[in-house]
Amino acid sequence: MITLDWEKANGLITTVVQDATTKQVLMVAYMNQESLAKTMATGETWFWSRSRKTLWHKGATSGNIQTVKTIAVDCDADTLLVTVDPAGPACHTGHISCFYRHYPEGKDLT
């Protein structure tokens, strides 16, 4: 059994969400033990909102639910990779992914 490291980030686990089909990274959010348990129980993503200090069911308002396919744990047991089938855009701006901007803006580093 894998033991997750909840202590490193004060009870939170960084969670990378990836489209199970396209492999595109959709978003990064945080889970606490309760949101991970709800994710496991419902098969849909739940997160902890650091700003609102409350649980957050992704897509509950927008309808853009994320159905969980797999959950992987990194080598340090402090980050999760959750693959999902998204029902719509992941970003609150309406973009498919929250990673639609480049830094520095408009420039490639190569």
Curated annotation (Swiss-Prot):
Q: How is the cofactor bound?
A: Binds 1 Mg(2+) ion per subunit.
> Which sites bind Zn(2+)?
75, 91, 98
Any Pfam family hit = PRA-CH
Q: According to its UniProt record, which reaction does this protein catalyse?
A: 1-(5-phospho-beta-D-ribosyl)-5'-AMP + H2O = 1-(5-phospho-beta-D-ribosyl)-5-[(5-phospho-beta-D-ribosylamino)methylideneamino]imidazole-4-carboxamide
| EC number assigned by the record | 3.5.4.19
Keywords, comma-separated and alphabetical: Amino-acid biosynthesis, Cytoplasm, Histidine biosynthesis, Hydrolase, Magnesium, Metal-binding, Zinc
Its annotated pathway reads: Amino-acid biosynthesis; L-histidine biosynthesis; L-histidine from 5-phospho-alpha-D-ribose 1-diphosphate: step 3/9
Q: In which residues is Mg(2+) bound? A: 74, 76, 78
Of the GO CC terms on this record, one is:
cytoplasm
Q: Which GO terms describe its biological process?
A: L-histidine biosynthetic process
Q: Where in the cell is it found?
A: Cytoplasm
Query: What span is annotated as the signal peptide, if there is one?
Result: none
Q: Which cofactor does it need?
A: Mg(2+); Zn(2+)
Q: Which domain of life is it from?
A: Bacteria
Assembly behavior? Homodimer.
Give the protein's function.
Catalyzes the hydrolysis of the adenine ring of phosphoribosyl-AMP.
Homology family: Belongs to the PRA-CH family.
Among HAMAP family, the record links this protein to: HisI
Query: What protein does this entry describe?
Result: Phosphoribosyl-AMP cyclohydrolase
What is the originating organism of this protein?
A: Lacticaseibacillus casei (strain BL23)
Tell me the gene name: hisI
